[in-house]
């Protein structure tokens, strides 16, 4: 829990900057057509549908086709979000893409999206905070709108994790899926939209979830390829302990910063990593099932894309409506976490 002094200090800073509000005026998602079921995985590795569902809650996931990339998926989601917002790309001031699986080390995937949609006025950059990346990017774009620096921002979470997986490792290949989700944020004098943010990290856990090679420490070589260092490595037990410890706590803190009680929240949208983690956090927050968004069964862990994809499904299915309060929470590699509250 936040100390009273810290709460007052952070709230004052956020409220001083919030003379303008950053409203979500458009949303969109994209998931590849190809569905990979647990039954299909059971023919590839030593696993079963029962084993996967008991441990993760996942039934199937989407896998990108060969011609699809993180940028192309992000572009699909961006166009859908702009369509819902009723805006053309030249209305955008900023594009942020949160991803751990960019098309290239450089240039930024956001620049590829900017070119693809024709958002010629927009600045563009990427954010990398693993599965917490989208909510982190949302805090950046929202804060820039609230400060008056910009009027509109396109925030995207997109991943093509399937390209990095070891499809012989049943402990990792069953977990992940591909996809993208996007928000369009717009400045407004009306109270609402993004109300608070809470970010944190525990860098001492940096080795807990890591893709060891491909960066400047271990650049591409035959040795790194032979050693399998271009595949994600995860201490699943440590990640579970971290996630269940952090997710409920940061959701509470974000609510406090927005002067909200958990009873005021219509929907909790957590990162869709694992059903057991989601259930543990929901129990900690004493939230009933109808107030918790779950779609990990259909998409698996889509990393930075999971929160916006889940939000889009909640909106499209009528789970949330204008005026509702929502909490978004992401956590992942770093170890890092981020939460935001918003009013629709």
Show which residues each predicted segment covers.
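Flexible, glycine-rich active-site loops centered on histidine and acidic residues
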Residues: 146-180
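Phosphate/pyrophosphate-binding loops at sites that engage ATP/ADP/AMP, CoA/4′-phosphopantetheine
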Residues: 77-93, 249-266, 314, 318-319
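Condensing-enzyme catalytic core mediating Claisen C-C bond formation in acyl metabolism
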Residues: 5, 10-66, 169-241, 245, ...
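Catalytic phosphate/nucleotide-handling subdomain of diverse soluble enzymes
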Residues: 309-329, 337-344
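Active-site pocket-lining segment
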Residues: 230, 243-248, 262-285
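Conserved catalytic cysteine-centered active-site region
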Residues: 51-72, 99-153, 283-311
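Buried hydrophobic positions in well-ordered alpha/beta secondary-structure cores of metabolic enzymes
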Residues: 24-26, 52, 81, 92-95, ...
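Acidic, glycine-rich active-site loops and adjacent beta-strand->loop/helix elements
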Residues: 30, 98-103, 129-132, 157-162, ...
